[in-house]
Amino acid sequence: MIQYPRYRQHRFSSFQVIIAGFAAVGLVGALLLMLPIATQQRCVTPFHEALFTSTSALCVTGLVVQDTGSYWSAFGQSVILLLIQIGGLGVITVGAAFALLSGRKISLKQRSTMQEATAAPQMGGIVRLTGFILRITALFELAGAALLLPTFCADYGLRGIWYALFHSISAFCNAGFDLLGTEGAKFVSLTRYAGDPLLTTVIAALIVFGGLGFLTWEDIYTYRLDFHRYRMQSKVILVTTAFLLVLPTLYFYCFEFTAGSAQQRILLSMFQSVTPRTAGFNTADLAAMGSTSQALMVVLMLLGGSPGSTAGGMKTTTFAVLLANMWATFRRREDAEFFGRRIDGSAVKNAATIAGMYLTLFFLGAFVIATAEQLPMSVCLYETASAVATVGLTLGITPQLGVLSQGVLIALMFLGRVGGLTLIYAAFGSSPAHSRLPQEKIAIG
């Protein structure tokens, strides 16, 4: 009797499911944006431009090759907004929400994937956390739209309702897409509202709130202002976020925006310190800013928001853990510490890995674009930082880039959104060593 070999069914890991989900939604979005109905001129958008826009929206980046307000129709803008919302919440979270609404039970495998997608510390209570994420997102986005409504309705009439909702979702999801461009003035972002205290403050607040992370908001909701009861991660996020908001604001106020009234300078300084982490709106001419300010914005872009949030970048916790580990090394301590707690050694190793991966992609992408487009390296570094950290700020070169350079940015945006560890674990899986090799010291520094 002939026995045929049995082929073991391949099981996708949670990390591979997350990546496949983002890729599938991005491709569907690109196909929808290619339809003639998606543009105001009823023309077919080239695939690479549609894919670039779809990836930018899904990865909540904001880099565009066509002006969103003047090129895309109401249908196209709706597709972009849907992609932004899916990307902000996460493909897995949105899928879980539909499953919950339909009354289906969430399997153990699905709960594990949801845990990885939301950066939750444990699998228990993950369904409840998903419900909280949906509620808090709806609350902030609707409240933001209501606050933006008077300004946009005053300028655009009934269209202002759509503008308020679009920009509120775009801000909370840290996407940076705007509808304010026209045929005569494209890619203007929020520059016309630079002196509007209400609009700039609301947009900035939505960006910060979206970038804090849903676990942080769960702590705030549960314990209110009792900071000592927050989990260590939430404490680190809040302190690091405050640090990364206040110091750049002071720098911009003192050295960059030195003209105009005190109110104008404060608004400009505050907004330009918020938006690099990682929203993509701007109220100032970024290309006209000094080289030192542009370099500071590159650093802020790479650091990004917080884990389990709508923001991208290396994440505030990565930055904080590296600083804590450096401080521990200076003091010749074995462990890095925060708020009376030791940081797990694997967290330090992961932080170093993520930082190394982001910096490698950042420099490699800039090198390829600078070579292909014959552009200054400083401009390309700004562009690749914006892409890999899913920010969306640009010095104006994005629409002029060739297909190769657009492909590089698409890859950087995708890799930046799915996350460093997700990509690593999906690519290499887990293969624990059965034995340990002999150890030998190596000189460092």
Please report, for each region that a protein language model flagged, where it lies by residue:
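Membrane-proximal intracellular helices of multi-pass ion channels
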Residues: M1-G445
